[in-house]
Amino acid sequence: VRSRVISAFAAEEEKRVLSLKPVLAPHHGRYGDHPHQVYDAWPAEDPDAPLVILLHGGYWRYDRMHLTPFAAYLAGQGLSTVLPGFRRSGGAGGYPKTFEDVARLVDTLPGGRPYILAGHCSGGHLALWCAARGLLPPGSPWHTSTLPTGVLALAPLTDLAATRRDGLSDDAALQLMGGEEGFDAHMTSVDPLTLLSGAGTTGVPTVLLHGEVDEEVPLTQFSDYAAVHHDLRTVVLPGTGHYTLIEPGAPAAREVADTLWRMAREQRGPGTTAGPTDRRATASGTGLT
C-alpha cells in the first residue's frame, strides 16, 4: 500500500466538499431486490426536463451520500437527476456485481427516453463503460445496442491497468477486480480504454471534464483516453481540483451543469431551454417511475 501525500489545497478541498451535509431526496425507488439496488430522485419542475443519471465516485468503495448535495444542486438547475446506489467493492460488490448493477439500472430505463449518464471519478469509469457496452462481444451478458444518449465523465478513471500500476487509492482497482488473478482475467470486459482501443469511438456523444490540479485522479487518465477516442470533447478547468467539480455552486460545478444543458440541447434540438428551478416536482420527471 502506497502512502498518500496531497497538498494543503487538495486536503482543504476534500474536507470542505465531503463534509457537506447529505440532502434527502424527495423521491426514492428500487431497480432490484438487493438493499443496494436503490436510487434517489430529484425531479425538476418541468416533466420534460433533461434526465441525468448520476453515478457516484469513491473508487468503487464508498456510498452515494456524499453526492446528494450535488444531485440536489443539479435539480435546482432544472435537470431531473437520479442518483443510484449499487453494490460496491469491499462488501457485496466488486467484479462482477458492481457492473451487473449498473447495467441493470440503465437497462430498466424506459425505451426512447433520452438521458445523459454522468459520473465522477470511479462513477466516470462506470459511465464510460456503459457507453462502451456496444463494443463488447455479442455473447457477453453486458453487450447491448441500447446505449446512453450522452455521457459526461468528471475526473474519470479511464484506464484500470494504469490505476493498478499507480496503486491509486490503496490499490482500489485490484480490490474491484478481486486481486491480481481476477484483474488479468476480467479487465478486458470492463476497462473503457481497452474496449475503446481499435474502435476509436463508442458512438455515444461523450464529454470528459477534468480539473487541472486534480490530485486524486491523474490527468493522464484523461489524456490517454482522449488520445484514442476520435470524436471526444474534452475540457480541462484551470485551478480546479477533484472535488470542486461536485461542490454545489462552485464555478466548476456550474460548468458541469452548463455542460449537461449543452449536451441536452444538442440531443433535443435548439428549442430546448435552460433555467434553474428550486421548486419541487412529481416523480414522473425521473424517468424511472
What are these regions (language model features)?
Residues 107-166:
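Primarily recognizes the serine-hydrolase "nucleophile elbow" in alpha/beta-hydrolase
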Residues 93-111:
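Alpha/beta-hydrolase active-site loop
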Residues 62-71, 86:
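The serine-hydrolase catalytic nucleophile loop
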Residues 202, 208-210, 214:
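Short beta-strand/loop motif that positions the catalytic acidic residue
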Residues 240-251:
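Catalytic histidine-centered segment of alpha/beta-hydrolase-like enzymes
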Residues 215-221:
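Conserved alpha/beta-hydrolase "acid-adjacent" motif
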Residues 18, 162-195:
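Mobile cap/lid helix-loop segments that gate and shape the active-site cleft of serine hydrolases
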Residues 2-46:
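N-terminal cap/lid segment of alpha/beta-hydrolase-fold proteins
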